[in-house]
UniProtKB/Swiss-Prot annotation:
It comes from the Eukaryota. Bifunctional enzyme involved in flavonoid metabolism. May use dihydroquercetin, dihydrokaempferol, eriodictyol, garbanzol (5-deoxydihydrokaempferol), dihydrofisetin (5-deoxydihydroquercetin), naringenin to a low extent (10%), but not 5-deoxynaringenin or butin (5-deoxyeriodictyol) as substrate. Keywords: Flavonoid biosynthesis, NADP, Oxidoreductase. The lineage of its organism: Eukaryota, Viridiplantae, Streptophyta, Embryophyta, Tracheophyta. The keyword Oxidoreductase applies. InterPro entries: Epimerase_deHydtase, NAD(P)-bd_dom_sf, NAD(P)_dehydrat-like. This is Bifunctional dihydroflavonol 4-reductase/flavanone 4-reductase. NADP(+) binds at residues 44, 163. SUPFAM superfamilies: NAD(P)-binding Rossmann-fold domains. One of its GO terms (molecular function) is flavanone 4-reductase activity. GO terms for biological process: anthocyanin-containing compound biosynthetic process. Its EC number is 1.1.1.219, 1.1.1.234. The gene is DFR. It is an enzyme of class 1 (oxidoreductase).
């Protein structure tokens, strides 16, 4: 548990992972400095300010990955930093300058800020499975020694390619800098993060994870042979590794593997009202699962708490509660209403 006097900084604190991590850090007794791009934008920060203990243990700081040195003030005096912020624009017209360079330079800027502060004992970076397995031919099992093929990403330009390139190059540059400058740096590599959430808008990872419900066909390839982790498990692993004195290097954080067919079978059973497709253009009916090994994380003592069903039920419930996905009216109710001419219903 953190001490009340121990301050930690969370970058990208208003986002999907960042806001949940802030909530858990506050619960664990830490004083949190949360960086956001615009602390005055109530729509973007209200879910942080409404958290229990926010009034006494949370402060918001203005910082942007594109502005060199903008994290220095927030990090000064902190004993730990959780760098979660990352550009997540899959549709960028200028990916090199809008996504890739800001990600690399932003992470190096955080490392430099930690050096300048002289108080930071550990920096935890939220990396991505996109740094591990994006290559022409999938292996059956991936671990922390694997890296994505950047040239393959640049040549094929699949959905999200600039995100995979940016995270891979940023993490590699950071490892070089951390080793040269003797910084205690660890990276956590989540697979696709699913679960309930605090932010008001649709998290990018749920646009992908819920793509069979949302009919986002361009994202089906990403979950063809998918790996998943619950948002809460991921955030608790950040705190666990930060607090563990022997944690070092990279850690894959993934609790479940599922092909798109296995995922859809579960979703159709839970949500028949969405009429989720069972056939996917260009995707073989007989897929072998691809496994991301969390052996290293488990061996240091971390335990996952949530099932695949927990993740998706939590995500769908949160999206429905926030009005981000429609709640369809069951067909039998629609038919009954039409027959009685009581109401003109549109199935969502």
């Amino acid at each position: 548990m953190g001490s009340e006097s121990e301050s930690v900084c969370v970058t990208g604190a208003s986002g999907f992972i960042g806001s949940w991590l802030v909530m858990r850090l506050l619960e664990h007794g830490y004083t949190v400095r949360a960086t956001v791009r615009d602390p005055t934008n109530q729509k973007k920060v209200k879910h942080l300010l409404d958290l229990p203990k926010a009034e006494t243990h949370l402060t918001l700081w203005k910082a942007d990955l594109a502005d060199e040195g903008s994290f220095d003030e927030a990090i000064q005096g902190c004993s730990g930093v959780f760098h979660v912020a990352t550009p997540m624009d899959f549709e960028s017209k200028d990916p090199e300058n809008e996504v890739i360079k800001p990600t690399i330079n932003g992470l190096l800027d955080i490392l430099k800020a930690c050096q300048k502060a002289k108080t930071v004992r550990k920096l935890v970076f939220t990396s991505s499975a996109g740094t591990v397995n994006v290559e022409e031919h999938q292996k059956p099992v991936y671990d922390e020694s694997n890296w994505s093929d950047v040239e393959f990403c640049r040549s094929v330009k699949m959905t999200g390619w600039m995100y995979f390139v940016s995270k891979t190059l940023a993490e590699q540059a950071a490892w070089k800098y951390a080793k040269e400058n003797n910084i205690d740096f660890i990276t956590i590599i989540p697979t696709l993060v699913i679960g309930p959430f605090l932010m008001p808008s649709m998290p990018p990872s749920l646009i992908t994870g819920l793509s069979p419900i949302l009919r986002n066909e361009s994202h089906y390839g990403i979950i063809k042979q998918g790996q998943y982790v619950h948002l809460d498990d991921l955030c608790l692993s950040h705190i666990y590794l930060y607090e563990h004195p022997k944690a070092e290097g990279r850690y894959i954080c993934s609790s479940h593997d599922a092909t798109i067919h296995e995922l859809v079978k579960m979703l159709r059973e839970k949500y028949p009202e969405y009429n989720i497709p069972t056939k996917f253009k260009g995707i073989d009916d007989n897929l072998e699962p691809v496994h991301f090994s969390s052996k290293k994380l488990r061996e240091i003592g971390f335990e996952f708490k949530y099932s695949l069903e927990d993740m998706f039920v939590g995500a769908v419930d949160a999206c429905r509660a926030k009005g981000l996905i429609p709640i369809p009216i069951p067909a039998e109710k629609t038919e009954a209403a039409e027959e009685s001419n009581l109401v003109d219903v549109k199935v969502g």
